[in-house]
Amino acid sequence: MLRELVKNKKLRARVLERAEEFKLNNRAEENVWFRELILCILTSNSSFISAYKALNYIMDEIFSLSEDQMSKRLRLAGYRFYNLKAKYIANARKLYGNLKTKIKPIADYSQEEARQYIINNIDGLGLKESSHFLRNVGYFDLAIIDRHVLHFLNEIGTSNLKIKNKKDYYLAESILKSISINLGIQVGLLDLYIFFKQTNTIVK
């Protein structure tokens, strides 16, 4: 089922085009890395569409808005967790100027270590969100396990797998890495195929 999508030349070209955009982000300036970080904070426990809409409500004034003003903007955008995410974003602003210089050298050496560094140092990002951020700035060795990917794993018979802790995430990631190797694609891009399979679109 997924193999047919991977073999689809038109879809594969779209995924590879998206991958090139992520690689460009890797070479981009701090503002691009920061924007991707904020998007991933907003995507946590929310849909990409909702997160992207919320991002556009705050990004132009993200450094001038108070936490309370940011919360109100997010609420106006129809975003659910406006108070909590405003707090996370306000804290993330303190990283601006050092985000890329801190994370890139670690990720260039070990993407797993970079993911753990992000989890330890940036509020609001867990395994999924940290993997998502790293993928969006050009690192493709980590799995992004959202509800679409979980649904896919359960579809192919992985015993109703649920992500309740790190152990569950790492187990699911190991399964996805095996699938990716078998399909000849990088695991950080696998979710794009799965997302397309379930929604008929590529965003993220």
From Swiss-Prot:
Gene Ontology process terms (BP): base-excision repair
Keyword Metal-binding listed: no
Site (Important for guanine/8-oxoguanine distinction): 204
UniProt keyword terms in alphabetical order: DNA damage, DNA repair, Glycosidase, Hydrolase, Lyase, Multifunctional enzyme
Listed CDD domains: ENDO3c
Active site per the UniProt annotation: 128, 146
GO molecular function terms noted in the UniProt entry: class I DNA-(apurinic or apyrimidinic site) endonuclease activity; hydrolase activity, hydrolyzing N-glycosyl compounds
InterPro entries xrefs: DNA_glyclase/AP_lyase_Ogg (IPR012092), DNA_glycosylase (IPR011257), HhH-GPD_domain (IPR003265), HhH_base_excis_C (IPR023170)
Superkingdom of the organism of origin: Archaea
EC nos: 3.2.2.-, 4.2.99.18
Keyword DNA-binding: no
Family indicated by similarity: Belongs to the type-2 OGG1 family.
Protein name, UniProt field: 8-oxoguanine DNA glycosylase/AP lyase
Natural source organism: Sulfurisphaera tokodaii (strain DSM 16993 / JCM 10545 / NBRC 100140 / 7) (Sulfolobus tokodaii)
Gene expressing this chain: ogg
